[in-house]
Amino acid sequence: MQIVRALPDIAKTRTEFETYTLQWVGMEDIAVPLTLNIGGGKQQSLPAKANVYVSLDDAAEKGIHMSRLHAILNQLASQVCDKEGLDLLLRNMVASQGKISRSAKVELVFDLLLPKPSLLSNETGFQTYRIEIGGQCLSEKYDYSLKITVPYSSTCPCSAALSRQLFSDAIDNEFSTSRIDKQELLSWALTSTVATPHSQRSYAYLNLLLGNHGWPSLSSFIMQIEEAIGTPVQTMVKRTDEQEFARLNADNLMFCEDAARNVKTLLEQSSWIEDYWFKVEHQESLHAHNAVVIDQKYSKGAML
């Protein structure tokens, strides 16, 4: 006959350390599958990493019940991850700790995979965007945040002007007479690369505070960001798409300040955003350093 013995649980013993409350105790980097509404009536299932925390408000308690938090987090695998679902998750996290916790926090980090059509050729590729959804319940008050990283292309206006000057000088050197044959000029232009403006892959990092509001369609909002900047990076391209991409960059020459103002205009027009912090980063191909702009709506230290 097998004897069933009770397993020791030292967490129930009183702490031998100083009795202090602790703001956040939990686990980080937990794997969990998510299902998200991405817009247009579509859903996407994807792998994510989660950080979960609760407050330890009973100073006499040795620690929290971590396995209970893990079990509650696993429930996300069988439901759509939206504000209502995270409200319930946070409430259950607090309740799972008995009376030793009054607050809970969750952070979900994942790569959203979206189809991206080519500019002209009707081809389609796929692009990932790093997303972080954060939620917390403080004394039954809910607050949410959304972090998004969006890459784009930027071409320097100063470099473009310098390149145009060199091209003008080359025409002057090549054609010495005051009258130039149009066809001869066109033929020369097609075979003569005098100078090219420098451009680079750039990034917009957005940290948005939503208050007690849900987030919009992620795919639609990402598209709005890309349209505001004007030069989104591409996936699958053919020569006609690459040429159109070159035209877009010429039509949207920008310093980092220009990109930042375009982003800020969009954020200011988005009524569902209560506060924001953002950074645009141009990873210079001319310089060995990056050009950046950092801005925020309100001067809140938590956003820095």
Curated annotation (Swiss-Prot):
Pathway: Cofactor biosynthesis; 7,8-dihydroneopterin triphosphate biosynthesis; 7,8-dihydroneopterin triphosphate from GTP: step 1/1. Keywords: Hydrolase. Gene3D superfamilies: Urate Oxidase. Signal peptide: none annotated. The keyword Hydrolase applies. The record marks 156 as: May be catalytically important. GO terms for biological process: tetrahydrofolate biosynthetic process. GO terms for molecular function: GTP cyclohydrolase I activity. It catalyses: GTP + H2O = 7,8-dihydroneopterin 3'-triphosphate + formate + H(+). Its EC number is 3.5.4.16. It is an enzyme of class 3 (hydrolase). HAMAP family: GTP_cyclohydrol_B. Converts GTP to 7,8-dihydroneopterin triphosphate. NCBIfam families: PRK13674.1-1 (NF010200). Belongs to the GTP cyclohydrolase IV family. This is GTP cyclohydrolase FolE2. The gene is folE2.
